[in-house]
Amino acid sequence: MEKAEVLEDEYQHLFLKPLLNASTLLITFQGEAEALTVSINEQGEMKKVSPPQTSNLTFYGNQTEIIDLLHGDISLQHLIQSGSLKVKGSFRALLKLEAILWLTNGFFQRILKN
């Protein structure tokens, strides 16, 4: 399994620590051809995992737009509002992910390269 640190420095740690509670956040991105599932634990470690039975959040949409989202080129809110991306999961988990994406611009890039 590939692992990347969400928290690059102490400064980010101060902002993200309240978001990273004791439970692991499982997020699945399902495109037309393939799916990517990542977990983010309470230490801020993010790693690719095999798709679980259930994720906290599952995103369905166009593969290209999902990649743009993960690279930080387009906002999650924009894709959801335009209807390009469908979301299944809790509102709390969605808000948590949106906050993490906002505070760590494009942090998924590190895990996609591996």
Swiss-Prot record:
Pfam families: SCP2 (PF02036). SUPFAM superfamilies: SCP-like. Disulfide bonds: none annotated. It comes from the Bacteria. Residues 21-101 form the SCP2 domain. InterPro entries: SCP2_sterol-bd_dom, SCP2_sterol-bd_dom_sf. This is SCP2 domain-containing protein YusD. It comes from Bacillus subtilis (strain 168). The gene is yusD.
